[in-house]
Amino acid sequence: MRLVAARIGQRLNFRTLSGELGISETILKTYLTVLEKTALVYLLPEHSEDGRNRKHQSHKVYFTDTGLCAFLSGWTTKEALIDGAMSDLMFENFVIIEILKSYRNRGVEPLLSYFRSRGSRECLEFCVCPKFIT
């Protein structure tokens, strides 16, 4: 879980992560499915024009508990969270999870996704399916 926590807000590379853990990609995907089904992590899919094949796209990983994520990442002070190298990703994690919770608390599973631009700068462009906006 520490290696996953260190990758919040980043696209998951299953090959790299499974290699670092010394397990197969299949086992890694099983573990991530368990973490997602127990609501410890949220896997945000890449935006697809047709909405199909969401399971086979790149996903960004977010922790539903930012305190647990901070602990697993070794952030022991508020200064580390505010000024640390990953403070922007921790804030992104917080925003995504708050949006997710706002839908789920109303009993709605939102169709959220991220848009990956083809430019050189990586930035989060967040998509919300319009039919869920109230």
Identify the residue ranges that each predicted region occupies.
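Accessory nucleic acid-recognition modules appended to NTPase machines
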Residues: 1-133
